[in-house]
Amino acid sequence: MPSYRAPKIAAAEITPERFFLDRRTFIAAAAGSLALSVPKPSRAAALEASKSTYRADDPATPEKDATTYNNFYEFGTGKGDPAANSANFKPAPWTVKVDGLVGKPREFGLEELLAFPLEERIYRMRCVEAWSMVIPWIGFPLAALLDRVEPLGSAKYVAFETVVRPEEMPGQSGYFQPLEWPYREGLRLDEARHPLTILSVGLYGKTLPNQNGAPIRLVVPWKYGFKGIKSIVRISLTETPPPCTWNLAGPSEYGFYANVNPAVDHPRWSQATENRIGEGGFFGANRRDTLPFNGYAEDVASLYAGMDLRVNF
């Protein structure tokens, strides 16, 4: 696997102002704040994180836009539904079960997850719906967690599941369900272990809001946003490709790989351009060209050498 070549840091990048807590008090404070945040998900703890060289060249999307324009069907299908309907969701206490083809299956509590060395990474995020953002995530490499459980040689894929709590997630209740729960996603093991792939516990210097996937979510910046599964409760290593929610719902529209590709259109719209949220102009003005692999081709294209990306979309 090629080593990551960090892009240059542009002077125009927005670094949000925030304060930092002592490392020991931070872990307890962050976990405690999540527990106390119900039903006020806006109350978030500041997160201590080192500034990584993994930074997009673009200015960050305004925090208000990134936390009020979301896809999280567990809270509703409208873009404003997750922020409006997630106040009763309880992101603490929390555990993530890691099992399957591993030598040391175990559960990770929230304080253990927050204790991983955290970095701020400013990534581009491209939705399959042809809009995008630039978000300062806080998290740690997924590979660091996988190393703790010692994947077996037979493990080829990594499967993920979101929590199911219809009493707290109104999109999971009711007669009509837009998707099958739990929400599931998957990656090849080499994708999961790539340095760009992280588990995020925060954004904009604070713990994740409920509507953005609290308390922990996946971020894979060269893939469409639906691969970034939220509110993860289980990670399993498997030998075969795991089922993925949107791929099951519409296999001709949402592929397993879901790599950002301007040359492969969605059956119902073009993927050649995108609207950057916060800049306006969805119907033509201020649209920008979509980059192969969302601008990360130099670092990840070799993962798919020899593959027909029109077939393996």
Curated annotation (Swiss-Prot):
Cellular component terms, GO, for this chain's entry? periplasmic space
> Catalysed reaction per UniProt?
L-methionyl-[protein] + a quinone + H2O = L-methionyl-(S)-S-oxide-[protein] + a quinol; L-methionyl-[protein] + a quinone + H2O = L-methionyl-(R)-S-oxide-[protein] + a quinol
Instruction: Tell me which residues bind Mo-molybdopterin.
Output: N70, Y73, E74, C127, T162, N212, R217, G228, I229, K230
Q: How is the cofactor bound?
A: Binds 1 Mo-molybdopterin (Mo-MPT) cofactor per subunit.
Q: Which residues form the signal peptide?
A: 1-46
Q: Which one Pfam family would you cite for this protein?
A: Oxidored_molyb
Annotated GO MF terms:
metal ion binding; molybdopterin cofactor binding; oxidoreductase activity, acting on a sulfur group of donors, quinone or similar compound as acceptor
As for subcellular location, the record says: Periplasm
Q: Report whether Signal shows up as a keyword of the record.
A: yes
EC number(s): the record gives: 1.8.5.-
Q: Which residues cross the membrane?
A: none
In which broad location class does this protein mainly occur, judging by the first location in its UniProt entry?
Answer: periplasm
Q: What class of enzyme is it?
A: oxidoreductase
Cofactors named for this entry: Mo-molybdopterin
Segments forming a coiled coil = none
Name the InterPro entries for this protein: MsrP, OxRdtase_Mopterin-bd_dom, OxRdtase_Mopterin-bd_sf
Post-translational modification, as annotated:
Predicted to be exported by the Tat system. The position of the signal peptide cleavage has not been experimentally proven.
Q: Give the UniProt family note.
A: Belongs to the MsrP family.
Spell out the subunit comment. Heterodimer of a catalytic subunit (MsrP) and a heme-binding subunit (MsrQ).
For this protein, the record's PANTHER family field holds: PROTEIN-METHIONINE-SULFOXIDE REDUCTASE (PTHR43032), PROTEIN-METHIONINE-SULFOXIDE REDUCTASE CATALYTIC SUBUNIT MSRP (PTHR43032:SF3)
User: What is this protein's record name?
Assistant: Protein-methionine-sulfoxide reductase catalytic subunit MsrP
Write down the species.
Answer: Rhizobium meliloti (strain 1021) (Ensifer meliloti)
